[in-house]
Amino acid sequence: MNSVRWLGWPAVLLVVALAAVAAAADGPQGFKHRGFYLHEGWLYKHPFAVRSWSQDDFANMYQLLSRLGFDRVMNWPMFESMPAPLSEADAKALVDYRRTIDDAHAAGLEFWLAQTPNLTPPQSIAAKPWKERNPYPVWKHVRLDDPAEAAAYFAHRRAMMKIVNSADAYVTIDGDPGGYPGARPEEWLSVFLADRAAIDAHGTAPTKQRVIPWVWCGWGTDSVWGGNANNPPERIMPFVKASLEKLGPGMPEPWGLLPGRSNRANFANGRVNIVLTEEAGLMPRSTLLLYEAIEFEPSIPGSVLQFDIIRRCLRDEAQHAATCDGVFGNAQQPVMVLPNLYFFARGAADLSYLDTPDEQVLGDLADLLGGPRDLLVPAWRCMALPLEGLPADLPSRLRKAALSGEAGRFIPGGQRRYLDILAAEVESRRGFLEAIAKPVSCAADAAANLAAATRALVGWWRVHGYVNSGDENTPFSWQFVRDENVNALRAWAKANVDDREAVIAAAAKSLAASGTLGEEEAEKRLAEVAPGG
């Protein structure tokens, strides 16, 4: 049979080819790059805090990120904890850090190095090793409008970048932390000009290594933040717009942009930075940072799923998928929210995956890790499940389980530690729910239940040791327990504690006897969740 031909193509084949093109155009679309931000600014226990990780932990995380579907990683290693001039020990730490970049490259990831624009610590901080320093109480804001102060700071920054010279991009946030009231966009631009000069002089591939402004709250803002009725996201607009207007014509090539947004429109910066970036015509240079889509910050460690937030944020920005340079997500303690990382990466690569039911997403991740669905899925959901949804033997079965998948080999801290963490969290959740579910017929019952509930919550805190911006000597506080648990305990106490003083005294003695808290400390903490009146 003779077939009609067009430009040498048989008509049938031409129709098939055109149909394939149309299907591809109408089919699953996604962002061309997916990145993940590792925040090393918090000091608490391994492997929860990224700052506690070893060289091998970072190498494993990069391999895991690659298998989850990411192709970029950004680290904030807190070089701002190194005072000028660099000590021999700090210089060696920077040399060693280059291996971290090599490990990211070995995993097939681009490595972006994050820095703040103008923070530096005093020499006194160097009394401790770099990774053990807490700079938050002692940081100084360098005045970039003071030529002498700026020159000294840029010389110190250049000395560090001379050593850590192999990153694919050098990212600097616009002022959180950093900045100062009245700061001008020209001063923020001067940071990138200085970084460009340092890269051109010392970089391993200066024609490819980008400088990237992280647009977050606007350079020069003064308490313009919060996202409430008196402090809406729109208040940062003039600051961000002025910065973008200065960056556009002033940035040295090669450069990109990292506009960040909050996980909801009416909070913090909302979508202001993305909107202004598009209006400025800078979307093709931009990677969109969907901050807190994966996990809130700061956040107490816990298996909290944010699938609906991830869906909403990625769908919000899907309009830019074809024109922007990709997306980034972040988490404070990635080992606790691996399901969120997985869903973010899969959904960003293929937007149709966002329609996948939650249970199926968790099952898919369990399969990728090579672990039993019937154990991992309820463990990942434990913070949202009632007591009857958490079998009594789940912790022991988790501890006996194994992850046979290749991806499961690369969880920071190791798969055995990971499964033990999940088991400990389930134990805490079960212990807490059991305590507040038991009947109370007298003050002795109330004291026993109050002590048991507190013991469960403090027990989980001792596993992770989260203290916000504190250090290892920071004592237990209810602010280190998730709000939903504290609120539930207060509601229980209000309904069940009648003889307040007697109940608190007896519960405190029980907590002291078990070694949970000292008796005096326990009395103070219990009084906070069982207030009088």
Describe these PLM feature segments.
Residues 1-11:
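Bacterial N-terminal signal peptides that target proteins for export
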Residues 9-19:
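Bacterial N-terminal signal peptides
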Residues 23-40, 48-53:
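N-terminal carbohydrate-binding accessory modules
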Residues 39, 57-59, 71-73, 83-116, ...:
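Catalytic-core regions of glycoside hydrolase
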Residues 40-47, 79-82:
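Acidic/histidine-rich, surface-exposed loop or edge segments in extracytoplasmic proteins
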Residues 51-79:
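Catalytic domains of carbohydrate-active enzymes, especially glycoside hydrolases
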Residues 352-533:
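Catalytic domains of carbohydrate-active enzymes that cleave complex glycans
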